[in-house]
Amino acid sequence: MALNFNQYATEGNTFLKDYAKEMNMPNDRNKAGRVFTSIMHALRDIIPTEESLQLIAQLPMFLKAVYVNGWSIKKNKPKIKHMAEFLDLVRAHDGSAAVNDFEYSDEVAEQYVDTTFIYLRKYISLGEMEDIRDSLPKDLKSMIYSNLMF
């Protein structure tokens, strides 16, 4: 199997364009990319490593790269039990851009999380989404549960 990096770049750019449109930020793909990356990295931090590996197996190459970039597998995962804590973790992954990207609003941040998981259903099977949901704390299950059937 030959690696076709031009194809991965094209697919990644198409994904980002479509995702930015879905997130109602069609003219700011940089922001959309930061938001997506922050949400994926926060998810990666709280689900078991085995579940991350199963998720990665279903992602296209250009999303695998986003997911694993900077990943350091830790035995002690952050203790995130509530949506507000998850949103704080997402913002932490976004760094100094979080102030502008999430507009100081949990409502905006939660909408971005919901939209991201709906959008990910294009790439991730229902069974894998259920497995991810099952690995989440009770108060976080709704970020995937309410979006499973899309």
Q: Where on the chain are the PLM-derived regions?
A:
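Intrinsic-disorder-associated interaction segments
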Residues: 1, 5-8, 56, 79, ...
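The feature marks the first
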Residues: 1-49
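Extended amphipathic alpha-helical scaffold segments
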Residues: 13-16, 63, 94
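Residues that form generic nucleotide/phosphate-binding pockets
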Residues: 18, 22, 89, 93, ...
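Short, low-complexity cationic-aromatic patches
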Residues: 26-37, 44-53, 103-115, 119-134
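Extended intrinsically disordered, low-complexity coil regions enriched in Ser, Thr, Gly, Ala
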Residues: 46-79, 124-150
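Short, solvent-exposed interaction modules
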Residues: 67, 71-124
